């Protein structure tokens, strides 16, 4: 893993390492408890979580409507795409697709300040934490997204648990180091 994330570009070794999930599955298999890695798809049924458990604002997704989740923050600074550049990504998305609904995921003082500003400037954006009461509701909403754009962060892994495709943006870490979300497509990594 250290060879893959080494800051010295000449010493980097680009080799896919097993994911954490694969490592755990191997341990359980050696203990006599094999795990079928294809068995788990989502914590919810194929149609997603029960939208009736969400505030009314989130209950009415039209069949042809696109819902995009954006989770631009992470616990570690090196994993965060620069805020102003992410704002430009969202602004471009809103300009090119004014009919899309954009849901901003994150909790904390910086997230609140940032997302309150973004929602004032871009009415298609909704700051999820202002309306959602708990993690279960966030997971239900995530299960109805068409895609989540996320850093290497908890939100990438949460979206993976509800079988939502994730476009993941990597900074200080690398998907080849085994950190990619469950069942996520390597082609969707940046």
Model-found features: residue ranges?
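Catalytic machinery of carbohydrate-active enzymes
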Residues: 1-190
